[in-house]
Structure formats: C-alpha cells, structure tokens
A protein has these predicted regions:
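Non-heme Fe(II)/2-oxoglutarate
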Residues: 1-78
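Catalytic core of non-heme Fe(II) oxygenases with the double-stranded beta-helix
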Residues: 77-166
C-alpha cells in the first residue's frame, strides 16, 4: 500500500476503562469466544463483536466504538467503516504470530486495555518498531504491514479493521 504508516495515539480515559469493563462482563459467555484458529497463542479471542448480541446491545460499548471510529476518521480525514472488531486476552506466555490484514481491510488498530511491562506489539519494517502496551494507547497502521505480539504475562486488547468507503 502506498504511504504505509504506523501511528501511536493516546485516547482519553475512561474509553479503555469502559471497554475493558464490557470485556470483563461478557467474556464468560461461551458464545462470544471463538474456537477458530487465529494467530493468537495461549489466549482467548472473541468472534467479531460487531455481530455479538452482548456487545451490540451495550450502549456504553457502542458509544466507545463510535468514539474510536470518529477519532480515526478525523485523524486520517477519510470516510471509514468497521469491518471487524475483536477482544483478545493473552494469558501467561501468550503471544501473537506475525501476520497482516491486507486481504481484509485498509487500516488496522490495536487499543491497549491495560499496561504491561512485556508483550510488545512489533512491526516488521525498517527500522523495526516495537511498542509496549500502555492503557489508552492505540496503534493505528496500514493493514499490509506484518506485525505480531511478543510473549506476555497478561495483556488485554481491542483490535479492529477498517475500510474506506468506495
């Protein structure tokens, strides 16, 4: 993709706190957790929350999603929409295999829901970039950039993909 980028953005609290509260409330519903093979190792991941009733009916969560989308649209000056959003919680020793999303979306994001001293998100670019998880920080990047997450003790993130309207 032309003009590839990686941005580290700090969002206002209580956005991450409210999103984390929703995750803690709904992660115990077995219908929200996917069993499909993903790049997530030693962790749990939701199906697309845009399609899950618990999250669709939660007004606070929907307001948070709208806030994230509006922030990104304003930052990029583009008309965008969500194509997917997932929660991922990494357990002790959890990590994310290197991958990209070029086949699915134009832009990707990782919103950190807690602060960790490990579990950096890394990007396979020159020079290499590695970002430690800090609550309220969101990494926004071009979807074709290879990325992964290093081993962690316990990390919670909201990840998503966005497309431009044609």
């Amino acid at each position: 993709m032309k003009n590839d980028f990686i941005m580290n953005i700090t969002l206002d609290d209580p956005l991450a706190t409210n999103i984390l509260s929703c995750w803690e409330k709904y992660k115990h519903n077995k219908f929200n957790i996917t069993k499909v093979e993903t790049c997530t190792n030693n962790g749990i991941q939701t199906s697309n929350v845009l399609e899950l009733l618990d999250f669709k009916q939660d007004n606070i969560f929907q307001e948070c999603l709208n806030n994230i989308l509006q922030n990104i649209k304003n930052l990029l000056g583009l008309n965008l929409y969500y194509c997917w959003v997932h929660f991922v919680e990494y357990l002790e020793g959890g990590y994310q295999d290197i991958h990209n999303h070029k086949q699915n979306e134009d832009y990707s994001f990782v919103l950190y829901l807690n602060t960790c001293s490990d579990g950096e998100t890394y990007f396979n670019v020159e020079p290499p970039i590695s970002i430690l998880p800090n609550k309220n920080n969101m990494i926004l990047f071009s979807s074709n950039i290879d990325h992964g997450a290093k081993t962690c003790y316990n990390k919670k993130v909201l990840v998503g993909g966005l497309r431009r309207y044609s």
